[in-house]
């Protein structure tokens, strides 16, 4: 481990070693069904998680939502999302890495037996999990932060975890929700307080945001890049969803991205939700990155696909800059085959 993680009085800090990048692994969209009929695909998903985590050599693992999939029809997932969450957590705990999560739109569907509060209580009780419910007066569940410190105790980066919520009403057909205005204010206030403690202006505090549902500006950035706009910087990945789909909220206008551009602290946003998208672009000074997904269940035929499955490595350096790279499961399995014959 190239980092030390401490939680003192509910405040979590990660202290990185000097001269060695802090290595974070982003996982997303695991989609454990938790029923008898999904047991084979659940096993594949958990085996994939184990392979990716072990291959990553990460100091910390962040899962950006949809750990479980309590959809009882067609795909026959279990109503019991707590049971499914426990299956996922058991896998993570066995691997022994420190980890945390944010909620996706599927983690607590309206017909599921446990709400986000109950699921969050369970995650927070896990020995190696650093999930926090955050401020109960802010929209959602799980708006919290973890500070990354340099070896000398100075602030490096703030990891901001945000509940991007689920649907506008109670179901999928109402459309996806947004990060709400009070969550944006919570983000700003958190950075202002941390900055004041170390004598920095908000724009001098580097922060990275982790959530599930992408903002519409990711699509905007991709369209500009596709048309040859040199102001958009391509890093890696592709858009694999049919008709170049981006699953951002279509019926309500979110302000999060533009407010973060003006605020100046946020340098990167990491999300999931669209399982076949692995794109990473920098737009208006913010790096937007889809994590590689794990899902074997939610998309028809996705268990036969390979190019989107894996993890995303985020390396944070001494000066607070960072970089990302894809960690495809195919590469891990091919390397294992050539080294061991299995």
Annotate each language-model stretch with its function:
Residues 1-82, 87:
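N-terminal active-site segment of His-dependent metallophosphoesterases
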Residues 21-34, 156-166, 210, 287-293:
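Active-site-proximal beta-strand elements of phosphoester/diester hydrolases
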Residues 56-60, 158-161, 173-274:
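His/acidic metal-ligating clusters that form di-metal
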Residues 2-5, 145-153, 255-263, 275-342:
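Binuclear metal-dependent phosphoesterase catalytic core
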Residues 37-41, 72-81, 111-114, 172-176, ...:
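Short, flexible/disordered intra-domain loops and linkers
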Residues 29, 49, 61, 66, ...:
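Divalent metal-coordination and catalytic microenvironments
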Residues 2-16, 78, 82-202, 296, ...:
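Extended active-site neighborhood of metal-dependent phosphoesterases/phosphodiesterases
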Residues 33-36, 69-72, 101-113, 167-170, ...:
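Active-site environment of divalent metal-dependent phosphoester hydrolases
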């Amino acid at each position: 481990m190239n980092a030390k993680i401490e939680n003192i009085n509910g405040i979590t800090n990660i202290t990185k070693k000097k001269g060695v990048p802090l290595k974070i692994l982003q996982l997303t969209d695991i989609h454990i069904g938790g029923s008898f009929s999904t047991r084979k695909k659940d096993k594949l998903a958990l085996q994939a998680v184990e392979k990716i985590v072990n291959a990553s050599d990460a100091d910390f693992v962040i899962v950006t939502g949809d750990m479980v999939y309590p959809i009882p029809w067609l795909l026959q997932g279990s109503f019991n999302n707590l049971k499914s969450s426990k299956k996922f957590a058991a896998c993570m705990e066995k691997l022994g890495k420190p980890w945390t999560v944010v909620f996706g739109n599927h983690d607590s569907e309206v017909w599921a037996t446990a709400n986000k509060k109950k699921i969050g209580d369970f995650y927070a009780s896990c020995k190696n999990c650093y999930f926090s419910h955050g401020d109960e007066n802010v929209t959602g569940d799980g708006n919290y932060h973890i500070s990354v410190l340099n070896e000398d105790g100075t602030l490096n980066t703030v990891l901001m975890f945000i509940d991007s919520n689920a649907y506008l009403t109670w179901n999928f057909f109402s459309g996806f929700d947004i990060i709400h205005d009070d969550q944006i204010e919570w983000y700003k206030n958190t950075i202002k307080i941390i900055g004041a403690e170390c004598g920095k202006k908000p724009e001098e505090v580097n922060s990275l945001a982790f959530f599930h549902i992408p903002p519409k500006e990711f699509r905007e950035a991709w369209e500009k890049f596709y048309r040859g706009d040199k102001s958009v910087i391509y890093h890696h990945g592709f858009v694999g969803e049919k008709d170049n789909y981006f699953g951002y909220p279509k019926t309500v206008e979110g302000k999060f991205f533009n407010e973060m551009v003006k605020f100046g602290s946020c340098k990167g946003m990491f999300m999931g939700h669209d399982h076949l998208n692995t794109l990473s672009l920098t737009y208006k000074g913010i790096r937007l990155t889809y994590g590689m997904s794990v899902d074997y269940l939610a998309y028809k035929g996705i268990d036969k696909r390979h190019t989107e499955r894996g993890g995303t490595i985020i390396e944070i350096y001494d000066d607070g800059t960072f970089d990302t790279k894809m960690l495809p499961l195919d590469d891990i399995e091919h390397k294992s085959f050539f080294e061991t014959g299995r």
